Amino acid sequence: MENSKKTPLFTVYEKHKGKLIDFGGWAMPVQFEGIIPEHEAVRSNAGLFDVSHMGEVEIKGKDALNFVQYLITNDASQMEKNQIIYSFMCYENGGVVDDLLVYKFEEDYFYLVINAGNIEKDYEWMLKQSTAYDVEVNNISNDVSELALQGPKAEKILQKLTETDLSQLQFFYLQRDVTIDGVNCLISRTGYTGEDGFEIYVNPSDAVQLWEKLLEVGQEDGLKPIGLGARDTLRFEAALPLYGHEINRDITPLEAGFGFAVKLKKEVDFLGKKALIEQKEAGLTRKLVGFEMKDRGIPRSDYEVYHQGEKIGFVTTGYFSPTLKRNIGLALIDAKYAELGNEVDILIRKKQVKAELISKTFYKKNYKK
């Protein structure tokens, strides 16, 4: 852990009894009080996450929109100022470089939020693709700290510290230069939990002050610090993908069921478009499905999936769901077996254990309308 990178909030983890792990080269808290109580706090009240390990890249210049359009699968041409879209960057073969959020500040100024473990790879990828465009591509990850305040009471808690009317900020929109407890912030109504909430971007020197103040004013509303363990169970219940699990360089967004963020009809020949069109026209041979264990056993990532003795795929994520109180999972399997209600077997400790395919909508998301 000594060689791991540390966020500006590393100094407060011990105070809040954070248990540390190495996550993508970062020393991060996997839990504070415990994964299940933290998970339940976010579903019922609110939770505060340190997500300063995430990456931020600025795209600026005359060709900013054209470059972003070439880089991503979604369509940025229809974005309003201060709007956000979810998207993928793909390789030419349709596999995923990363999933990301695209923030539009101005017509010539975009801000991309990328996964912590992919920062160097993504930045090099963007630089390599940018040579034909009149743009600046700046990795500003070290200049930004990010906190996520998530849960049904997130707005109530954050409103105590700002004069900005947060009820006016719509889902997947941002506001710049918001003052929170005297600190200048960028806030967006986004998150990775399936709940309403905010992601707050601040100067690293202000991160500790803001973290401590939020926990102080949120205490009466049940706000708790949340580690990466509950962050993963929350995103999993909401069927949100994690890079390296539901998506990677060998799994396309279409196979993973995220076609809504892939605009094959947009005029720009974006990276991976040809391969994705061909895959759609030929028909998917693999699909991401949800499943529930029928017999005892918790499914885990990379466990093999069988149908009548034939291996048909693998588990991408599996957990005991704290909300549903059931053992459930996501798996990438042969499309011909992907019908809801089908019985499959998950290989758990060398034993095939029965499961049934169910909708991936494990949990109804509670986003602000």
Curated annotation (Swiss-Prot):
Keywords: Aminotransferase, Transferase. Its EC number is 2.1.2.10. Pfam families: GCV_T, GCV_T_C. One of its GO terms (cellular component) is glycine cleavage complex. SUPFAM superfamilies: Aminomethyltransferase beta-barrel domain, Folate-binding domain. It is an enzyme of class 2 (transferase). The keyword Amino-acid biosynthesis does not apply. It catalyses: N(6)-[(R)-S(8)-aminomethyldihydrolipoyl]-L-lysyl-[protein] + (6S)-5,6,7,8-tetrahydrofolate = N(6)-[(R)-dihydrolipoyl]-L-lysyl-[protein] + (6R)-5,10-methylene-5,6,7,8-tetrahydrofolate + NH4(+). The keyword Aminoacyl-tRNA synthetase does not apply. Disulfide bonds: none annotated. It comes from the Bacteria. One of its GO terms (molecular function) is transaminase activity. Belongs to the GcvT family. HAMAP family: GcvT (MF_00259). The glycine cleavage system catalyzes the degradation of glycine. The glycine cleavage system is composed of four proteins: P, T, L and H. This is Aminomethyltransferase.
